[in-house]
Design a protein with these regions (language model features):
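Intrinsic-disorder-associated, low-complexity terminal segments enriched in Asp/Asn/His/Tyr and depleted
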Residues: 14, 27, 39, 47, ...
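Cationic, low-complexity basic patches in intrinsically disordered or flexible, solvent-exposed regions
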Residues: 27, 35-36, 68, 73
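Basic polycationic patches enriched in arginine
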Residues: 3, 23, 29, 33, ...
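Short polybasic linear motifs
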Residues: 6, 21, 37
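Binding-site signature for planar aromatic cofactors or substrates
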Residues: 67-288
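Extreme N-terminal basic, low-complexity initiation segments
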Residues: 2-14
Length: 288
């Protein structure tokens, strides 16, 4: 059996092929839970078809693929039995910075040092004109006292939702570190100049993708998308690719930022910063 962070997953040894690398074994184990979060590297468990991607919880490990021929047979999973204790450490009022943005930066730095996969990935929640909530992951591309920055197609579903209801929520779900950050605020469209400055830093293929994709619109198949990208390559040749008029950034101006740290026996630590009329921040501790 392979014991993960959230439960137990069967890993048949007779159908498991392991790529060569340091600390390779048929039964990879987690490092001791007493490791401090910044030093304990994330253990990932993802699958694509019959391939499972595992990363060692110890520093310096390489990613390895496990082929599991029995995955097609399906699993009998008892979801109500998935549980674990949170032991990474507590969070105190004295340990928090007076500025929530600075505290976000501290936790982001620790998430990066822990080699988490996509530490800047954040769940963006919106509500459309019909009141339907939607969530998706976007990447944090800027952080300052002014707010949290991400970029997208202005004709996407998320952009239309923001136009109707600019109040949004962001979530940084760092499960391995037993941490969450929840941000509530208002999304504002950034200037064309700011968006262009960032667009110029993107890899060329990412620039092409921004032009090629009519984000959130139906498409016949993958081949059609690839052809649209090829058409853009031919259109611009070897020249510079300008910023599309339909693409740009949003800045989420925070009014509320909550920090959550998992605690033993589900007695978690929660602190919320709320912005006052004077521009200062008030800090409160919340019950879990």
């Amino acid at each position: 059996m392979w014991r993960g962070l959230a439960g137990v997953f069967p890993l048949p040894t007779d159908s498991c092929n392991v790529e060569a690398g340091p600390r390779v074994s048929q039964h990879p184990r987690l490092a001791p839970r007493q490791q401090s979060p910044p030093d304990a590297i994330a253990r990932s468990f993802a699958h694509s078809g019959s391939a499972f991607l595992c990363a060692s919880f110890a520093s310096g490990a390489r990613y390895r693929y496990y082929e599991w021929s029995g995955i097609e047979q399906g699993l009998s999973v008892k979801y109500d039995t998935f549980r674990r204790e949170y032991t990474a450490g507590g969070l105190t009022r004295e340990g928090l910075d007076a500025c929530p943005i600075r505290q976000v930066e501290i936790w982001l730095e620790q998430a990066v040092r822990a080699d988490l996969i996509d530490p800047t990935g954040m769940v963006l929640a919106t509500v459309d004109e019909g009141g339907e909530p939607r969530q998706r992951i976007v990447l944090l591309k800027g952080l300052s006292d002014a707010g949290f920055v991400f970029y997208t197609n202005h004709d996407s579903d998320k952009a239309h939702a923001i136009e109707c209801e600019p109040r949004v929520s962001l979530l940084f779900p760092w499960n391995v570190l037993e941490r969450q950050i929840i941000v509530g605020g208002t999304a504002e469209k950034m200037s064309d100049a700011e968006s262009a400055d960032y667009f110029m830093t993107r890899p060329r293929e990412s620039q092409i993708a921004a032009w090629a994709s009519r984000q959130s619109r139906p498409i016949a198949d993958r081949a059609m998308l690839e052809q649209q990208a090829e058409d853009i390559r031919l259109q611009f040749g070897d020249g510079d690719i300008p910023t599309p008029a339909f693409w740009g950034g949003y800045r989420v101006v925070p009014q509320r930022i909550e920090f959550w740290q998992g605690g033993a026996h589900r007695l978690h630590d929660r602190f919320v910063y709320r912005k006052c009329a004077q521009g200062t921040w008030n800090i409160e501790q919340l019950q879990p």
